[in-house]
Amino acid sequence: MLFNQTLTYISLFSGAGVGCYGLLEEGFECVATNEILEKRLNVQRINNKCKFNDGYICGDIKELETKEKILKQIEFYSKKFGNDRVDLVIATPPCQGMSVANHKKKNDEIKRNSLVVESIDLIKQIKPRFFILENVPSFYKTGCIDKNDNLLEIGSMIEQNLSSDYMLYDEIINFKNFGANSSRTRTLVIGVCKEFKDFISALEFFPDFKEEKTLKEVIGSLKPLSWGEYDSTDFYHSFRTYPKHMQEWIKDLKEGQSAFENTELNKKPHRIVDNKIVLNVFKNGDKYKRQKYDSIAPCIHTRNDQMASQTLFTLKMIECFPLES
């Protein structure tokens, strides 16, 4: 916390900084943000996420140099602004190796899963008042390789390393029950420094339960778009064109139906190889599926009422981005 009582945080695996946007709206100040891809950090720069350019740290969290840059920025805030301690560390390690949506898993995914170990290592060094880890539902039970080259469940690794200093709470929740406009089931792990055990518990961090919204309630008032059309009131509400032959796949679908359910071969998702129809592999049950207007929005696919994918504007509404962002 700074001299002026402003709460501080550090974001690991921060992507384009979407999650951090909410923290900034709540008055937190970002001491450092770490992301391996420069183009994602550039989005954060555009949104002025950090006050100082040194706060944008591009690099692999496994590298000592990257960790030292984060720790150096913490020291800078301590000396310059009286930050007695980082209040919050948030980490969302890559989940591709754990996600059921990833059908292209590689044999070395457990190494990528083990990036969470680097997060825990930094939390031990930073000693924040609180930390939050967020990931896929299987997160806590997924295997990782710890610093001693032992294979163990991520949950066990977290508890072994942090339970002596933090009260730990993990739960699988669906964010649709807490104000999100789409169905998103995730594991949350919340750590509260034991110094505060008599004052606060992890459960107090959860927002109040909210009634879920249907897709119609979220985007139903927006203007329908024709092929290639832009809404004159918002550039980002625009019809994203796609290969015309795909229209046959989706034009006759009813709400909730997938193009893979079409009975005619040429209306199923496919490609042409040697003048023959080769069907696409049916991996995700909701791919090429027309959404239901009176249900909570799933992952992003074909609209319910148009032969189109969602626009950037509707995606912002479904994913709860601030519309002015």
Protein language model features and the residues they cover:
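Active-site donor-binding loop signature of nucleotide-sugar glycosyltransferases
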Residues: 59-61, 175, 302
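A residue-level signal for beta-strand positions that form part of recognition/binding surfaces
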Residues: 6, 186, 297
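Class I SAM-dependent DNA methyltransferase catalytic core
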Residues: 212, 253, 262-325
